UniProtKB/Swiss-Prot annotation:
Protein name: NADH-quinone oxidoreductase subunit I
EC number(s) on file: 7.1.1.-
Cofactor: [4Fe-4S] cluster
A Gene Ontology molecular function term of the record: 4 iron, 4 sulfur cluster binding
Gene responsible for this protein: nuoI
Domain 4Fe-4S ferredoxin-type: 53-83, 94-123
A Pfam family matched in the record: Fer4_7
Length: 163
């Protein structure tokens, strides 16, 4: 009797039919992947992407040249030169450079900044063709801040209860 059952299974190709049914279910199921360059997935508010220097709403840069980000950077990727003190006692940076080749995107600079001047924004598409383009100066960082300010402010506001 066992040989008849085995012959029936082989003749009716039960394993083949069940495997084919499984394949067809997966074929018509929704796709789990994205067509990346054309479709982009959601990014976490805590995502650490391209660096940016922020400005106050009046247009003045936030960085007060305290150099805490330079001191805490484990990769020593940040270089800051502070300008002379102003009449009101504040000072600003003359030079603010980040070597993105050295940067390990740890976020320590963002955590150390007392005025939220340096942040890691939501941009993850900043590949370049040359190394020189990965040396960010103050102008490039401020341009990034201007470009991504709305998203950066939203992400900081969402993360505020946990800071």
């Amino acid at each position: 009797m066992a040989s008849i059952a085995q012959a029936a299974k082989s003749l009716l190709l039960k394993e083949f039919a069940s495997a084919f049914a499984l394949s067809m279910r997966q074929f018509f199921a929704p796709k789990a992947t994205l067509n990346y360059p054309h479709e982009k997935g959601p990014v976490s508010p805590r995502f650490r992407g391209e660096h940016a220097l922020r400005r106050y709403p009046n247009g003045e840069e936030r960085c007060i040249a305290c150099k805490l980000c330079e001191a805490i950077c484990p990769a020593q990727a940040i270089t800051i030169e502070a300008g002379p003190r102003r009449n009101d006692g504040t000072r600003r940076t003359v030079r603010y450079d980040i070597d993105m080749v050295k940067c390990i995107y740890c976020g320590f600079c963002q955590e150390a900044c007392p005025v939220d001047a340096i942040v890691e924004g939501p941009n993850f598409e900043f590949a370049t063709e040359t190394r020189e383009e990965l040396y960010y100066d103050k102008d490039k960082l401020l341009a990034n801040g201007d470009r991504w300010e709305r998203e950066i402010a939203r992400n900081i506001a969402m993360d505020a209860p946990y800071r």
